[in-house]
Regions:
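Helix-loop "lid/cap" segments that line or gate small-molecule binding pockets
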Residues: 124-129, 138-151, 162-165
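Active-site loop/oxyanion-hole signature of alpha/beta-hydrolase fold enzymes
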Residues: 2, 32, 41-83
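Conserved HGGG/HGGXW glycine-rich cap/lid loop of the alpha/beta-hydrolase fold
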Residues: 7-54
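Gly/Ala-rich beta-loop-alpha elbow adjacent to hydrolase catalytic centers
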Residues: 84-88, 92
Length: 199
């Protein structure tokens, strides 16, 4: 049976790339990016509390890294080039530090690690206050007027179709667990993991 929380792209016999999304993201976001690496086997799991992964705690960096390790092992093991985005960079660094034999190299995109606690408190509180939208149009507007202002329309449409769900209160929300996201923001105050020099 296929695990809906693990997204696989590219040939099964290609070099392995483990793609780790950022906060409030999901593994399927790597689909368009993976098209630029047609020779590679891209493994892109949803993190705990995101997408189709379990939403139950623990939500620590260690729990996320254990999930990444298990997903990598289930799909042929490493070593893999680990590509992280934002929060995914912190997880990639911890994976490289704790399991260096599984990591062939690191690519860190817009890394988030060892962030100021007061900033993380603001972001976590904002997450609690603003975790849903009136409708899909409001969610789209939030993306377009924020960090997704230069994302092609077709990718934004795909994001809304894949990741926006009914919140159960007449509103819509992203397919994430608010408690998991808030806890994960707190994890980013921890000291940055330093991988072995060999990676």
């Amino acid at each position: 049976m296929t695990d809906p929380s693990v997204h696989l792209f590219g040939p099964t016999d290609g070099p392995t790339v483990l793609a780790v999304h950022g906060m409030t993201g999901h593994g399927r976001r790597w689909r368009a990016w993976s098209e630029h690496l047609p020779h590679a086997r891209v493994i892109a799991p949803d993190l705990i509390g995101h997408g189709h992964a379990p939403y139950t705690p623990p939500w620590s960096i260690e729990a996320q890294v254990a999930r990444l390790s298990a997903v990598l092992a289930a799909h042929g093991g490493g070593p893999a080039v680990v590509v992280g985005h934002s929060y995914g960079c912190a997880l990639a660094l911890h994976l490289a530090r704790t399991e260096p034999a599984a990591v062939a190299g690191l690519v860190l995109l817009d890394p988030a690690a060892e962030l100021p606690p007061d900033r993380l408190l603001d972001v976590a509180e904002s997450t609690v206050r603003h975790d849903d939208y009136t409708d899909a149009d409001e969610a789209r507007s939030d993306k377009v007027h924020g960090a997704w202002n230069d994302v092609p329309t077709e990718l934004l449409d795909e994001e809304l179709a894949d990741h926006l769900i009914d919140a159960g209160n007449g509103r819509v929300r992203w397919r994430t667990g608010t408690a998991a996201v808030v806890a994960s923001w707190g994890e980013l105050a921890r000291p940055m993991a330093v991988p072995p020099a060999s990676i």
